[in-house]
C-alpha cells in the first residue's frame, strides 16, 4: 500500500501518489465573449499575471459576470475558490460553472447543517443549552467531494459560502493517512482493513452505506463519503487483483482502476500519537485553569470544569470521541494557543485564485464571523463549561483569511469601500452582450400602494411574467403574502427563516410558473438570475437604512435587468438621497447600453435560460443517500469540527420529503401520536422561552397552532389555511398564524 507522502514546502501542501496527468480548464459554451467581456477578461488575466493581489470587477446585472469568471479561470489555469454570500447564490454559481466546465471538477462546499443549536450558557437565568444539530447527508457528500478533488487534481473550482473559513481538520493528516491502493504494490487484506478503520470507516457487512465498508472473503467493498458508487477491492494473498467501481444495488462493475486513493470518511482524522499528546496537554490545561478559578473564589466553576474535562478525557481515551470534541481541536491539531484552525483553504495549492462574488456583502460577512463566534464561547469559558483552548475552535479572522489567499478578484455591481480602496485594478463590465437595458424606474406614492401593486401583478401574470416584491421585515413579508393569497394570487415568501434547500426550490417554482410572485427582504437582491421577472416592487423605498441604501437599491433594481420589459416601482412619499443616487446610476448605465445597442444594431431580447440549480447536484447525491437529514454525535471521525457558516442559515431539520407537505405528513399520523407531538413541542417551546431563545419559541408556537387546528377540526378559514400551507411547501413548519387582514396602507 502506497501512502501519500505529505510535506510543506514553502507553505504549499505537496501530494504524491495521485494517478493521472493534470487536465486543463476548458470552457464549453456556444457563445464567445462580447460586449464588455473581452476587455474585462483580458484586464483581469493580465492583472493576475502581473502580480496584482486585489482586483475589482464591477459588473452590472446581466452582463455575464459568471462567464467572465469562467473565461478568466480558463486562461489562468489556477485552482479557484469562488465565494458567495449565501447558499442560494452558491448553488446558482455552482450550477452555472458546472455547465461551463463539464469536463472539470466544479464542487460545492457549504455548511451541511439543516439545523444547528450551538452550545451556550445564559448567566441571567443560569441556563445551559447543549449543542444539537441535524446534518444533510447530500451536502456532506458534496463537501467531501470538494476536499477529495482538491487533493487529487488541479482543475478544481470550489464554490463555497463562508463555511470555508471554519475548521475542518488538518489536510496533512487527511492526506497522509489515506491509503493509495495500487495493483503493483503488495498489500494484505487485513492491513487494508486496519487502514480503513484508522481513517474512520465503520465496518458493516450487511448495509453498505457511505463511510462504511464490508468484507466478504477476499473481497472488500468500500463506500467513500465523496463517491457516487462504492469501490471493490479483490485480494489474493498480498496482491490486489481488482480495483473497480461497482453499482451498489446490482454489484455490476462500472469502471476498473489500476490504482486509486481512498480518502478518509471524516475531514478530521488524526494519528494515535497525536491523540495521546492531546490527552496530556488537555489535562495540563485543565489543571492550570482550575487553579485559576479557585484562586478567584469561583469554586462551582472550578468543580464543573474539572468534572466535565475528566469525563471527556476518559471518553477520548477509551472510545476515541466525546461530546463537544471540537472544543479540544487545538490540542488534537497540535496547534499553539491563538493559532488559526485548518480550513478548506489549506487544502488548496499555494498558487490558488480566490473570486469573491457579491463582495460588498461577502467581505463584511467574513469580517463578522470571528467576533460572533467568540462572544458566545467566552461566556462558556468564564463559567467553567469549557477550557480557554475552546476559543481556538473558531473561524478565521479576516486578516488570517487574507494571509492565506495569494490573489483576489472581487466581483460586484456595487463594490464596497474596502474593495475599492485596496484594488490595484478596477475593471468595469457595463455593456450586456444581449443588449438588455437597465430597467425603467417609476416612483409612486405610498398611499394605495397595495391596490396598485395588485393591479401591476395581475398585468404581469396575464403576460406569464413574474414579480418580486421587497419589504423591510419578515412580518411584513408574511402579512403581504397572506394578503395576496387571499386575493387569489399564487405567491410565496422567502426570508432568513426559510430552510436552505427550500430557498432553491422556491426560486425554481417561481421560474417554472408554479407561483407568480415572490415576496422577500434582502434575499431578493444579490445575484439571483431570474429572467422571467419583469417587475420588481420596492415597498417603503424612502426608509433610509441598510435595506434601502444606494447599494441595496441598485442590487434590488438589478433583479429586473434580465428581462427586456423590466420595470421597477418604488413606493415612496419622498425621494431620498439613496434613491436619487440609485436612479441616476441606473440611468447612466442605461444610456451606455443604449448607445452600444444603436451602434451595433442590437434589439434587446430576454434570454431564456434553462432552469438549473444545485438541485441537480442534490439529485445525484439522493441516488445513494437514503435519509434527508440526521443527527450526528461528535467524534474524532464524524465531522465534529464543523460549525454553521451563516447566522440564521441553519433553519429546522429537513425531514419532510420534497413531494410531501407537512400537513400531508401529519394527516397520516394517528390522533394519539399528534397529541403526543403537540405536548412535546409545547414543552420545548416553554424551555426555549425560558432560555430566552424567542425565535425558536415562536417557531414552535406556530407549529403547535397548526397541529392543534388539525386536531380540533377545520375552521371556516380551512381553505385559506390549506392554501397557505401549500404555498410554503418544503418548509418544515409552515406559519400557523391566522392573520386578521393585511396591515398595509390601502
Summary of predicted features, one role per range:
Residues 50-73:
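Walker A/P-loop
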Residues 8-58:
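Conserved pre-motif I regulatory segment
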